Amino acid sequence: MQPEFKKKSIRSFVIRGGRMTEGQKNAFDKWWPHYGVSLFDGPINPAELFGRSAPLVLEIGFGMGDSLVDMAIADPDSDFIGIEVHPPGVGRLINRAGTEGVPNLRCYMADANDVLSDCIPDGSLDRLQLFFPDPWHKKKHNKRRIVQPEFVEKIRAKLKIGGHFHMATDWEAYAEHMMEVMTAAPGYENIAGGSEFAPQPSYRPTTKFERRGENLGHGVWDIIFSRSL
């Protein structure tokens, strides 16, 4: 399977190489019909998708998927949707979710901007998660950073009033950029107050990558804003 795209725009990601394992390939045959959602299916009805009404969490760029599966298992009273463009990560996520019988998780293999525009109803999300997005640290590539004024306004429309937009990054310059964009964005409030970074919430797992960075003295910054208007 290949990632789904619809609208032409500046991409905040690069489709990286990397072969799928046999287990990941088999996961698409076995588990995609249950866990996968197509961009081209159009707007979702979360209650129909999950068979119940529950708090809804959307994660953009779940990587290899372990932390998202962990969150879904740890919070069975909420429903989770993940978006990822890299097939090996999607294959790993659905393989683990299927093997472990995780009922409250679905995913897209598509461009997040397309999914937000075409599939996620306004005012439907209790939380949107964006953990460790590509920092595009070269200045000439800064425009590719996903956190931009237009993007955060799109997120605000998808959140419920009081819903949270939670970002995390291990690049200090990107953390400062995120804070600058969010502080200037209308209709948001920083739950930590002012321009303060938030402590890591208990629901966000610490990844192996993050622990490695911490052992090397790297920082991690959490930014959490709620929709106020």
From Swiss-Prot:
Residues 140-145 are annotated as: Interaction with RNA. Keywords: Methyltransferase, S-adenosyl-L-methionine, Transferase, tRNA processing. Belongs to the class I-like SAM-binding methyltransferase superfamily. TrmB family. CDD domains: AdoMet_MTases (cd02440). Pathway: tRNA modification; N(7)-methylguanine-tRNA biosynthesis. HAMAP family: tRNA_methyltr_TrmB (MF_01057). Transmembrane segments: none annotated. This is tRNA (guanine-N(7)-)-methyltransferase. S-adenosyl-L-methionine binds at residues 59, 84, 111, 134. Substrate binds at residues 138, 170, 207-210. Its EC number is 2.1.1.33. It comes from Saccharophagus degradans (strain 2-40 / ATCC 43961 / DSM 17024). One of its GO terms (cellular component) is tRNA methyltransferase complex. The keyword Transferase applies. InterPro entries: SAM-dependent_MTases_sf (IPR029063), tRNA_(Gua-N-7)_MeTrfase_Trmb (IPR003358), tRNA_methyltr_TrmB_bact (IPR055361). It comes from the Bacteria. The active site is at residue 134. Gene3D superfamilies: Vaccinia Virus protein VP39.
